Amino acid sequence: MTTPAADLAPQPERPDRLETERLILRDFRLEDTEAVHAYGSDPEVTRYMPWGPNSPEDTAAFMARVLEQQATWPRLDLSLAIELKAEACVVGSIALHLRDIRNASVEMGYVLRRDLWGQGIVSEAAAAMTSLGFRLGLHRIAATCDVRNTGSYRVMEKLGMRREGCFRQDRQLRGAWRDTYLYAVLAEEWAAGRR
């Protein structure tokens, strides 16, 4: 049985840096602002996102928010920069957003620079974050995406998430209603799939 997130004591090692074969997932730094703005201002990258394309002011506000959140522990939102080791620069971000403390449930979100799509980078980062979440005692990790965002829901399916539903016209995106897929994976499903 997993422990509700509210009962978790702060971990001896804060999960502000994870390393995979090709990536470093780490806290943001002020000097990442230009790289963050490069992907956050790209209309194609933000096409299905509920935010963006970002202005320089939007990016500055995002950076101020994540840098402030990084100063606290435990965090309700664990947003990490995705750094590609080969480039030694930030190419995207990934986050776990605490949605339900009592039931140890979070929502995962991610974004990646367009020239790196289709290379398994988000899948690699998402697997590391999912493992971390369950090691920290989470029970359920969910993710949502616009139904037209095939790249995003393929990442969710690679993680072993199940499509739990489709919310019809649940939000407006740039003046038009969109449908949203909901995917999730439970701790025991993740453990069974990783044996």
Regions found by a protein language model. Give the residues of each.
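Acyl-donor (CoA/ACP) binding surface of acyl/acetyltransferases
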Residues: 1-47, 64, 79-195
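A short gly/proline-enriched turn/hairpin at secondary-structure junctions
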Residues: 46-54
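Hydrophobic residues in alpha-helical segments
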Residues: 40, 49, 70-72
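Active-site rim helix/loop that mediates acceptor-substrate recognition in acyltransferases
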Residues: 55-76
